[in-house]
Amino acid sequence: MRKCIACLLCLFFVVPVFSQTASTISEILEKDAASYLDFSYLIVAEAGMDSTPFEAYTWCERFGTFPLGDTPDSPITAKTVSHFLMKNYELGGGLMWSATQSPRYAWKEMKANGFWRKSFDPDRQLSGRETVQAVSKFFDENPDIVLREPPTAAASHDNRALLLQDKEEE
């Protein structure tokens, strides 16, 4: 009897969490141009954390690999995805990647390793479907990979104010 009650309780608490993730991912898949928010949400969801897309972006922004002029709603490019994955999952690469750690050489490394198609432009804005496929492919090819700790302990000042405002409204 206790096992049945425990199973029912788990069902009531676990299913809504997965349905929220599934609905968010479905929304991402339908987009013509995925944003930093979408990419960040996929990374954080893969890490097993539960968050909103903006909370995920704020967490990923702490790594310092997103371009400074871009906003959370800016379309994400293949070059930016490559740079985030190579730098923050501490993947090794060739001489130019090791020397510069630049987004362009991150993209070149991943393209040379077969991650991106040969005809893929580094500045191509990824659709939601392409972003989900890229993140899934990355974790399928690297099942034991671990994200490094963010070098910044807190969210940027602008994002911190927005997060606190959001919490006050709840």
Where are these regions (language model features)?
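Membrane-interface interhelical connector segments
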Residues: A56-F63
